[in-house]
Amino acid sequence: MRKIQKHTGNGRRSVFTKIEPYLYILPLFLLLGTFKMYSTVYAIVKSFYQWDGGRISVFIGMQNYIAMFSDKVFGQSMMNLGIILITSILKVVTIPLIMAEFVMRVKSKKAADFYKYAFIVPMVIPSVVIIMLWRWIYDYNGLLNGILSMIGLERFVTSWLGDAKTALGAVIGYNFPWVAGIQFLIFLSGLQNIPDGIYESVELEGITPLQRLFYIDIPLLAGQFRYLIITTVVTAFQSFEHILLLTNGGPGATTMVPALHLYNQSFSYFNMGYACALGTVLFLMTSFISYINMKYIRTPSASE
């Protein structure tokens, strides 16, 4: 009888041991379920309603989604998003990588540390301050036009954010030279984790720095590329603060992006049902692009 009781007690402890790790993360899942999953599901449901954010809520089926096809502002915003997304990915995977390669090749430790801190310091500056600084740079009486006038290029002086021909390009050029930030640190840490033995072996074969970049560094940084591309895609779909402060989507809709259009529909026109439909479409597009990125960007090991 004692043996049976002892066996039962051990069985209970064994079951508890198996579920114990899940109990520790249960509060996190409850919080995510309450504040993330519930709100996401609720927004998807409300996308089928004509809803003002209050009590007025009328089921209209797919009408909000059908309205997107005739929404010229949404169409323009998607075109702008495509351009911004492509240029953002190019900016993220090129210049920060080049700067990380440069720092890795600096032989003086003090000089390398100086460059690291120089690229990191701008991260602590509030983004609103940086946005307003660039708004002044692009102003008709701002720094950019002042430099152009100084070097004799007055014919290029224009209202960069107020001209439909230059507004989108100015938004893309915002925060030039796109070096400082987490992208630089991610590439730098990835390069530092590549075993020295790999470099020593290829140096004996007389490989050039350019060959080293394309045949060793870039393949072994596939994980970093994948992470940065995913975060860039998500940021491009969700971010609109700098556009709101720089141009507010104008002139016209030349710099409008879907996230800002969603914001306007929600808090300017109180068309919450349509805004939920916009959010649902953006969520599905972001998920699809992230899935493609995760599936086709393979992370090799250093041994390969």
Name each model feature, range by range.
Residues 17-304:
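A structural signal for multi-pass alpha-helical bundles of membrane permease subunits
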